[in-house]
Regions:
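Solvent-exposed loop/turn segments at secondary-structure junctions
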Residues: 86-90, 130-135, 173, 215-219, ...
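Short, charged loop segments at secondary-structure junctions
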Residues: 76-80, 90-92, 116-119, 130-182, ...
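Von Willebrand factor
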Residues: 148-206, 219-220, 243-254, 280, ...
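…and closely analogous acidic/polar surface helices at protein-protein or active-site interfaces
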Residues: 66-79, 88-124, 151-152, 171
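C-terminal "exit" segments of structured domains
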Residues: 25-27, 300-401
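VWA/integrin I-like adhesion module and closely mimicked acidic/polar interface patches used
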Residues: 199-204, 208, 213-291, 299, ...
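Bacterial N-terminal signal peptides
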Residues: 1-4
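Acidic, polar low-complexity linker/tail segments
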Residues: 12-94
Length: 403
């Protein structure tokens, strides 16, 4: 069956990636593969026939039973930081009349419940962020290593206790998005933290940030700060950031205020047509997700927030798995593999190649070969011990008879 026949609504394929390093166990190689649609969302409905493996330029076959869908694989270890906008605008209501803070926390609660049902080793922390100075100093919500390093397993009651405390609070800070992202990425990429760095040949934990904001960076010097942030994010590859804008899109704001165009940052402020608390910087949130291979979504109401977080969950945990036997193992040799994903109506997409090494002991011989070798060696040893003794016995007997 073709992919599009199985799921006619599936968007066009966009990219394929071999996640982490191939795992080599004797003659068996196992890959984890992430496939995205053209819009950046995870492609979850592929079948085994949509995948082809190329090792050192040659196709390699795998058995259907050695392929696992994104719903069948055991999730890898995952660490998720929820960066929750705790600015004053989160007290306002969304397009359906729900408090944004209430809607966001309810959606996070549903996300964590769904994550726990996946039965993987997933740890989560919710970190509120916002900046308060002067008379608003009590509104300050800085993101520090201590605030980040409060992970609990998904489903742990301590997370629910934290969500209740946040829901009972009253956000009053201004929005500072870039610094919290920077501090969280630095936390995850600390080379001295053994939780996020593992020896070669082991599954590397996934580290993800989910940023939920209903606003924009309103500090002085924003353009330069954003440029520095993007430059910083482009230099790392291990942390994926998914961004969720909570509110109306600039296009929707343009229609609401009859601008006859998309709303811009220049449209907000005193004497301007768009209310400051309604503007969400879609362009910047999308760019942050793009440079880290994340997903960018927008939600006008609480129900949509929950639905978008489900997409993020699949993006974080949705990986295919394929195992195959190394066709030409040579002890200590290096191999290169790439994955090709196809469908009937889309052009094929290829992953970047990944290198892996065959162990110095090579692969085990088939069982029949091992049995033949044991039998042969046993026979040689038996004959080698028996025949000399037999000839010696005959010689002694002959000498006795000749006397």
């Amino acid at each position: 069956l073709s992919l599009l026949w199985v799921n006619p609504s599936l968007a066009k394929l966009g990219s394929a990636e071999i996640v982490g390093d191939p795992i080599v166990n004797n003659n068996k190689v196992t890959l984890r593969i992430k496939v995205k649609e053209h819009n950046g969302r995870p492609a979850l409905d592929l079948q085994d026939e949509n995948f082809r493996l190329i090792v050192d330029g040659q196709p390699v076959k795998f058995k259907p039973q050695d392929w696992k869908s994104s719903r069948e694989t055991t999730p890898p270890p995952v660490w998720i930081v929820f960066l929750l906008d705790y600015s004053g605008s989160m007290n306002t209501k969304d397009s359906k009349g729900t408090s944004k803070l209430t809607g966001a926390i309810d959606a996070i609660r549903s996300f964590i419940f769904a994550t726990a049902k996946r039965n993987g080793d997933t740890r989560v922390v919710v970190v509120p962020f916002g900046e308060g100075q002067g008379v608003a100093a009590n509104c300050n919500r800085p993101v520090t290593n201590d605030e980040i390093d409060r992970f609990f397993p998904a489903g742990d009651f301590k997370i629910e206790s934290q969500l209740k405390r946040l829901a009972a609070g009253k956000p009053c800070a201004s929005t500072n998005i870039y610094d919290p992202i920077t501090e969280t990425v630095k936390f995850f990429t600390n080379p001295e933290d053994g939780r996020f760095t593992v020896p070669e040949g082991e599954i590397k934990p996934r580290t993800s940030i989910i940023l939920l904001s209903d606003g924009y960076q309103n500090k002085v010097g924003e353009p330069a700060s954003f440029k520095r942030l993007i430059s910083f994010l482009e230099k790392q590859e291990s942390v994926i950031i998914h961004t969720l804008g909570y509110g109306l899109t600039p296009e929707e704001l343009g229609r609401k205020y009859r601008l006859n165009r998309t709303a811009k940052r220049s449209d907000i402020g005193i004497g301007k047509p768009v209310k400051e608390e309604e503007f969400v910087d879609k362009e910047k949130l999308s760019k942050i997700a793009q440079v880290t291979s994340g997903v960018a979504e927008f939600s006008p109401d609480a129900q949509a927030v929950s639905e978008k977080l489900d997409i993020f969950l699949d993006a974080i945990l949705g990986e295919y798995e394929i195992s195959y036997l190394e066709p030409n193992p040579e002890r200590g040799s290096k191999r290169q593999i790439k994955v090709i994903v196809t469908s009937d109506k889309d052009p094929k997409i290829e992953s970047k190649p990944k290198d892996y090494n065959i162990g110095v002991f090579g692969r085990s011989l088939p069982r029949n070969h091992r049995l033949l070798m044991v039998f042969g060696i046993g026979t040689i040893l038996s004959l080698g011990g028996f025949l000399p003794f037999w000839f010696w016995g005959k010689q002694l007997k002959r000498e006795v008879l000749e006397r």
